[in-house]
Amino acid sequence: GTKIWTSSAHIADYMIAIFRTSPPTKENRRHGLTQFLVKMKQPGIQVNPIGQITGQYEFNEVVFTDFFVPDDHVLGEIDGAWKQATSELAYERSGPERFLETYYVLTELVRAVGKNPDTRSAEGIGRLVAQVHTMRRMSVSVAGMLQAGKEPVVEASIVKDIGTVWEQQLPHRVRDLAAFVEETATNRETLEKQLSFAIKTAPKLTIQGGTTEVLRGIIARGLGLR
């Protein structure tokens, strides 16, 4: 089989993967999935790096052909990986990296406008910072639920959806505000370079960790809408 969009597989010694180990049932089509720890450096595994518009290679396609995984590399319950995976995703989807991946362009903008920004810049930056604080509180709230032993699948999906859409839009908002930055700003060149990089990398943000469409389906089910 083939797995697409595997982060850092080209430099990894091991990866975690879910494979079908028995047929699904009529009652549960997700039954029969098992999670394994897979050794990457072995025959039957081919990693194809995927180039990005930024020139980086971060994601990969992994092709499996007649490779072997020993029994002691099973993670968790045999045939019960779906529940494990959805629980694990609550950790992945609610963390601060889901709204801070392009945050550096905002900090560079703050440096560029200096201590006495014009009214438009001050209002724009203030609005963005308020949104960051709101998302941080949401992320911390989900962390508290996880610490209490709960499974905030819907709540984590909301954080990821709101956060990645926001950080995808952030470089464009900063670009609009950067138009008012003085040409003499000491970090003007740095800001422009970081903006260029952030705009190129932003499209991936609503795909990695679960696409926006998948997340909204999870949220809809949690609310009883589907």
What annotation goes with each model-predicted range?
Residues 45-137, 205:
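Glycine-rich beta->alpha junctions and the first turn(s) of the following alpha-helix
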Residues 4-9, 53-54, 204-209:
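Glycine-rich phosphate/pyrophosphate-binding beta-alpha loops
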Residues 119-122, 133-190:
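C-terminal helix-coil-helix/basic helical segment that borders enzyme active sites and/or dimer interfaces
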Residues 2-46:
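A short core secondary-structure module
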Residues 20-24, 39, 43, 65, ...:
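Short, well-ordered loop/turn and helix-capping segments at boundaries between secondary-structure elements
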Residues 84-91, 95-99, 178-226:
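Glycine-rich phosphate/cofactor-binding loops in nucleotide/flavin-utilizing enzymes
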Residues 5, 14-16, 35, 59-63, ...:
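Tryptophan-centric aromatic hotspots in well-structured domains and transmembrane helices
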